[in-house]
A protein has these predicted regions:
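Conserved, hydrophobic alpha-helical core segments of structured domains
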Residues: 1-100, 165
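Charged substrate- and nucleic-acid-binding regions of tRNA-handling and nucleotidyl-transfer enzymes
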Residues: 91-165
Length: 165
C-alpha cells in the first residue's frame, strides 16, 4: 500500500487498517471479506469495484452487502442475519470490529418465519394486499421479539389482526 502497487487496480484503498483489524479476529482467511475490509463502507463503490474486477454475481452481492456495514448492525445481530443472511451478517460484524455481536451468531441458524398468508386469511381478513401488510407486521414483531416460538407467533398474528380490524 505504501508503494502504491494497488492504486492502478484499486484506487479506493486508502488504508490497510481495516484489513489488520479483520486479520486479528478471523479464524481463517476469506478473500471476499478481506477485499471488503480494504474498501470504504459504501455499497455503490463496492459495486463499481466488483464490476471493474469482473466478480461473479454472487461475489458482487456479498461484497456490496459487506460494504453496507454500519455501527447499528451490532444492535441486533440475529435480526441482521435474518434480513441479509448469516454470511452477510458475519461479514458486516467482523468488518465493523464488532466481535461481541459476532459471537451471538456462533452456532445460530437463521429461522424460517412460521406463518403464512393463509393464517391471516383464517383470522377473517380478505385475501389481498391487507393480508401481505399484516403478515409483514407480524413478521417484524416476531423479529423484534427475538424469534419466539410458534405459539407466540400465533399470538402476535392475533394481536396484529385485532389491531387492524
Amino acid at each position: 500500500l505504501a508503494h502504491g502497487i494497488f492504486a492502478p487496480v484499486l484506487p479506493e484503498i486508502v488504508s490497510a487498517d481495516g484489513l489488520a483489524a479483520l486479520i486479528a479476529v478471523e479464524d481463517a482467511p476469506d478473500p471476499v471479506r478481506r477485499l471488503a475490509s480494504l474498501l470504504p463502507a459504501d455499497s455503490d463503490r463496492a459495486g463499481a469495484v466488483a464490476k471493474r474486477l469482473k466478480l461473479s454475481k454472487l461475489t458482487t452481492k456479498r461484497l456490496v452487502l459487506a460494504a453496507g456495514r454500519r455501527p447499528a448492525d451490532a444492535e441486533n445481530p440475529r435480526a441482521l442475519a435474518y434480513r441479509i443472511g448469516l454470511e452477510g451478517a458475519v461479514d458486516r460484524l467482523m468488518l465493523g470490529s464488532q466481535a461481541a455481536a459476532f459471537a451471538e451468531l456462533d452456532g445460530w441458524a437463521v429461522p424460517t418465519f412460521p406463518l403464512s398468508g393463509g393464517a391471516i386469511v383464517a383470522r377473517g381478513i380478505k385475501a389481498g394486499p391487507e393480508v401481505a401488510r399484516l403478515l409483514q407486521a407480524s413478521e417484524a414483531q416476531w423479529v423484534a421479539e427475538g424469534f419466539p416460538d410458534a405459539a407466540r407467533v400465533e399470538q402476535i398474528a392475533d394481536e396484529v389482526v385485532r389491531a387492524a380490524v
